Amino acid sequence: MNENAMLTGKPSIDRPWMKFYPEVLRGIQVPACTVEQYLSVRAADPNVIAMHYYGVDITWGTVFRKVDVTARALQVLGVKQGDQIPVFLRSVPEFIYLLLAAERIGASLLCRDNTLEENIEAVQKANAKVIFVHDFFSKAEIEAYREQTNVNTYVIVPALESGDRAAMPVYLQHSLDALYPDVPARGSDTMMWADFCNMGQRFRGFVPAPVNIDRPLLRAYTSGSTGPSKQVIHSAHSIIGVLAQMNFYGASDKFRPTWLLTILPPALIAVVVSMMLLPLAGGMLLILDPFVDVYDVDLEMMRYRPNNWPLIPMFVEVIRRSKRLPADYDMSHMLAIGAGCEAFNNKQLRNVEEFLKQHNCNLRFTAGYGSSEAGSNATLPMAPFPVRDGNVGVPMIHSVISIFKPGTQEELTYNTPGEICMTGPGVMLGYDRPEATAKALQVHADGKTWLHTGDIGYMSEDGVLYTMTRGASPRFGGGDLMVQPLENIVADADIKGIKDEFFVIVPDDEHEGCFLPYLYVQLKDGYTLDDVRDKINACLPERYMRPVEIFTVPERPFFHFKTNRIGLSKEIIAKRNQQKEKAKRNSFADGCIA
């Protein structure tokens, strides 16, 4: 981009965000190599510690020895090029070994963390013969798989196969112990991880697959928190497309930073790419902590004092509410701090910024934008503008983001709301359903394949992306219900007594294609809805913005680490249907009396 050139009005052509990238970063290239080759650059010394897992340091030499054994064992079990390997593991070292081993043999990992029925469905579709599970896999679960799938080998990975229980604090041990069923899965079709590895060590006929960085490597289902769960497919090429653009994030030229990963499972693309592989590729020490209870993340932060810790709004809420965090606890150990997973409204941002200031963390709290389909992150916090009103940063250096008229390929100009679309090296190969892929991945007139996200937002003349809502939600009578702007209006009104608030948008059962807004508020002690209801309605300038009903919640509810809007929406619809049924019965009764 020529920074002195006049803007054409088309972000995809102007790329105004490039002015925020220093020259040294503009030279970043996306190499055409495997994930293993990309990581090997950081593994020149096999004695360097790559990961720490519950008291055990794991060197790069150990990592690649384990990968070799795992790849051989997979071939012994008959896993071939093109096969899908269902892996139902937490973020443990064995997951990384399996990912790199799958790459060596030309297979792909299949990850899902939904209901038992949905997980079984994924295995059925894959026609998998081998799956990997933890040792807290239950008898009831394995019997369901035996009845409904063609799996003939269940490889059982102990939760602490690579860790030391004695190194775990008591609260961690309790959290792990709570996962185990009364009757675990056992049988002639099960195999322990150690036996699996021994089988690989003995095998001498290993034949690696031809290198193909564009074949499927990682398949993961979306969480289903914003709609039906879909299988997203990525290759080594698309994974490295994200890693190469991000591996300077959270780094330091003065010391080797640590990177703590708590709880979040590798069933999420962002976890694998931006939270497991990124720190390894960036030369940081990855600390895996998958079995901590979400309400104990405050204790783990104090125990490890990490330099980097991928946060989500749920984690932020836990540490903010913590009664165990000393008032003088110093968070200056953090090198960068921000949150992804879902949008923050202005009230949430003010709350967390005040909290960080109280704990000597003088970093700028940032928010980013991304998706499973985008390979994780799509933006970075490079622009010096306030993180307010949906500001999620600027496109990554080799990615292009622009705004299009929804349902079309017509690019819009700056400050005009529309569908957020992107093109770049991190975009997925597609979904497992061709019709869904064709809708999401479209070749535009510029010859590039663009990902149509379904998200609504706009871009400023500086190239800063602002998110507004997910999809179009018109209200009958006029007006579009955009979640983030609605929440920010209430947040900026700073109504006395409100600690937190969020909207849930529900289909209008009387007007097809239209929607209705409901507001949930967390109130401070001593306040009731009567104290805030009129002020809420008064601050929303247009009638269509005002909620049908306002509910109170003791705290923000979460599902799959996101605000549980789907669950609350179902509750609203169920309550509405009950009221209709009751009204119908009353009407019938009145007619009988008459």
Residue ranges and their predicted role:
Residues 106, 240-259, 267-310, 322-324:
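Conserved AMP-binding/adenylation subdomain of ANL enzymes
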Residues 53-56, 70-115, 262-265:
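Conserved AMP-binding/adenylate-forming
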Residues 64-69, 197-204, 213, 232-253:
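Conserved structural elements of the adenylate-forming
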Residues 185-191, 306-310, 324-388, 400:
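Gly/Ser/Thr-rich phosphate-binding loop
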Residues 502-507, 517-522, 532-594:
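Conserved C-terminal "lid"/linker of ANL adenylate-forming enzymes
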Residues 1-58, 62-77, 81, 161-185, ...:
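N-lobe entry segment of adenylate-forming
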Residues 131-136, 309, 424, 429-430, ...:
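AMP-binding/adenylate-forming catalytic core of the ANL superfamily
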Residues 59-61, 208, 217-243:
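Conserved AMP-binding A3 loop
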